[in-house]
Regions:
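Active-site and donor-binding regions of nucleotide-sugar-utilizing enzymes
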Residues: 14-19, 24-34, 38, 58, ...
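A nucleotide-sugar donor-handling region in carbohydrate enzymes
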Residues: 2, 48-53, 78-79, 152-229, ...
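C-terminal amphipathic helix plus adjacent low-complexity
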Residues: 3, 353-395
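Glycine-rich phosphate-binding loop signature in dinucleotide/nucleotide-binding domains
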Residues: 10, 98-105, 209-210, 289
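Short acidic-hydrophobic, aromatic-tinged amphipathic segments that line or gate anion-handling sites
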Residues: 77, 161, 273-276, 335-340
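Donor-nucleotide binding loops and adjacent catalytic segments primarily
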Residues: 48-51, 56, 199-289, 394
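A donor-sugar binding/catalytic signature common to diverse glycosyltransferases
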Residues: 108-110, 116-119, 131-132, 159, ...
Length: 395
């Protein structure tokens, strides 16, 4: 595989980080910076999200430079094929080739995307494998992410969980307790790192919006977009929301979602404004000033908890029928709304009224820890040799 990356060979541990989507760039932003500080580090991007608004803009937002001094990963690996089988095959084949060539001493992945399946290559090559966001489960087999989670959790040498819920789940399935750690979510550190930029964003002026006079929408998950029944149910509910509140609904729209809407011919209410995907700083400025946020994003519960912790609560409503973040529900940080009109309107009404009355949850401790990147690099540094000795019988 053609690339220009070479290790510095400065004596530090050689760590490769694999990712391939916008959420991974966001969640890993602080960890990548910390790894570059303490490791001989290589970041590989598998380019699942190839659109500039879903990739390039986020390297820039977080000022994530590669070893060549440019915004972006050290190695860009094209993997997207004409179908899922080809894409997953490319991820496995090309990651195996790259890992075989560069032989990192540790390989780090986060989450449940198809890019995380590159972990299989690291495992087969006996490279110590570290997994962030381990143990998350929504118990919904319709979600492709649920399959990926199980695969990567089981094969990882060290699992790093956000919450006690996740750690207990892994322990109950028989995975080694001595190599499973609760680190907390990396999102608070990422949000705090960019908070000044978020607050300075002029996105409201650029889009002609006013504080508390719009609703922010994000809907992109496969179960909401690709299922005909769920798609019609959700966007019928969105139209009803526009009718009831009679204000702009700004839809930060993923290219796949936009294509699905165009192909379906579904007529959105004129008050629903379909917008290109927004950058991290702009999107969070919009979240902080919206009357309510309606989203199927996995980061919503964590963002809601963070904003609550800094005295800026948001009315967060999740348009899903399951969640892998029960700890945030337990803390009262968001409402799980479902996707029918009745469910969504009731949830929105409740979220807005509670915010206005100051009836709030409490910040989830797992979501407001700003030392996660430090924990991650320490765990990696400490366990590379342990895994080599105890798992692979090296040395």
């Amino acid at each position: 595989m053609e690339h220009n990356f070479t290790w510095k060979n400065d004596g530090r541990t050689k760590v490769m980080i694999g990712c391939g989507t916008r959420p991974e760039i966001i969640r890993l932003a602080a960890v990548i910076k910390r790894c570059r500080e303490y490791f001989d580090c290589c970041v590989v991007y598998y380019n699942q999200n190839w659109d500039r608004n879903l990739s390039t803009v986020f390297w820039e937002d977080f000022e994530l430079k590669n070893t060549f001094g440019e915004y972006g990963p050290d190695i860009l690996v094209p993997v997207v094929g004409e179908n899922l089988g080809v894409t997953c095959g490319n991820i496995l084949g090309r990651s195996y080739e790259l890992l075989s060539e560069l032989q990192p001493e540790g390989y780090l992945v986060l989450g449940d995307t198809n890019s995380c399946l590159s972990a299989i290559s690291a495992k087969r090559l006996h490279i110590p494998l570290f997994h962030m966001e381990a143990g998350n489960r929504c118990k919904d087999e319709c979600l492709p992410e649920e399959t990926n989670r199980r695969i990567v959790d089981v094969i990882s040498d060290v699992n790093m969980c956000y919450s006690e819920f996740a750690r207990k789940y892994l322990a109950d399935t028989g995975l080694p307790k001595e190599r499973t750690y609760q680190t907390g979510s990396p999102m608070a550190e990422v949000l705090h790192m960019n908070l000044e930029k978020i607050q300075k964003s002029d996105v409201l002026e650029r889009l002609g919006l006013e504080k508390d006079k719009y609703i922010l929408l994000s809907a992109h998950r496969e179960e909401n977009i690709d299922s005909e029944k769920n798609f019609l149910s959700l966007f019928t509910a969105i139209n009803a929301l526009a009718e009831k509140y009679d204000m702009p609904i700004l839809y930060s729209c993923h290219p796949r979602s936009k294509h699905r809407l165009e192909k379906s011919g579904f007529q959105l209410d004129p008050r629903v404004r379909v917008n290109e995907p927004l950058g991290f700083n702009d999107y969070n400025k919009l979240q902080m000033n919206a009357l309510a946020i309606v989203s199927d994003s996995g980061t919503l519960p964590e963002e809601s908890s963070f904003y609550l912790s800094i005295g800026h609560p948001i009315a967060a409503v999740c348009i899903r029928t399951s969640t892998e973040r029960p700890e945030a529900l337990e803390a009262g940080d968001f409402i799980l709304a479902g996707i029918t009109t009745r469910e969504l309107l009731n949830a929105i009404d409740m979220a807005i009224e509670m915010k206005q009355k100051g009836v709030l949850g409490k910040p989830c401790p797992d979501y407001v820890d700003e030392t996660v990147s430090m924990k991650v690099v320490r765990i990696i540094q400490g366990y590379v040799n342990v895994v080599n000795k105890m798992v692979w019988r090296k040395g």
